[in-house]
Amino acid sequence: MAIERTFSIIKPNAVAKNVIGSIFARFETAGFKIVGTKMLHLTVEQARGFYAEHDGKPFFDGLVEFMTSGPIVVSVLEGENAVQRHRDLLGATNPANALAGTLRADYADSLTENGTHGSDSVESAAREIAYFFGEGEVCPRTR
C-alpha cells in the first residue's frame, strides 16, 4: 500500500478537555506518524476560508463561531491508507452514530462540536495541509 498523508484538527471542545495527548497517543497506537503539528486560534477569516465549501449552508455561521471559540491543534499524519484509516479512527461525523472506541464517541459533544476533523480524500488532505502548513513545516518520518 502507498504511504499517504492526511490532515487532522483537534477542535476547540476537545482542546478544552485537555485530551490532546490522549488523541495523539491514539494516532500513534493506530500506526500514524505525526509529521507536522501546531496549535493556533483561528480568526474568523481563516475559519471562513477553510470551510468555504459550506458557505451558505444553515450551519455555516455556527461552525465558524465554534471553530474560532478557542485554540485548535492541526496535524499532518502519515501512514498507509492514512485518509481512510484516520476517518475510521474518528468515527461518524454525527457522534450519535459513532461507534464505541472512536474519537468522536469519546470526545464529541454534539454534531458541530464533534471534537475532531479529518480529510475525506487524498486531494482534500493536500489542500487542507497546504492551508495551514508552509514549506518546510511538515517533516517526513517514513522509514
From Swiss-Prot:
EC number of the protein: 2.7.4.6
Pfam families named among the record's database cross-references: NDK
Give all cystine bridges in this chain: none
InterPro entries per UniProt: NDK-like_dom, NDK-like_dom_sf, Nucleoside_diP_kinase, Nucleoside_diP_kinase_AS
Name its GO BP terms in alphabetical order. CTP biosynthetic process; GTP biosynthetic process; UTP biosynthetic process
Q: What cellular component GO annotations does this protein have?
A: cytoplasm
Catalytic-site annotation from UniProt? H117 (pros-phosphohistidine intermediate)
**What NCBIfam families does the database record attribute to this sequence?**
PRK00668.1 (NF001908)
Record protein name field: Nucleoside diphosphate kinase
Give the originating organism. Escherichia coli O127:H6 (strain E2348/69 / EPEC)
Traced from the root, the source organism's taxonomic lineage reads:
Bacteria, Pseudomonadati, Pseudomonadota, Gammaproteobacteria, Enterobacterales
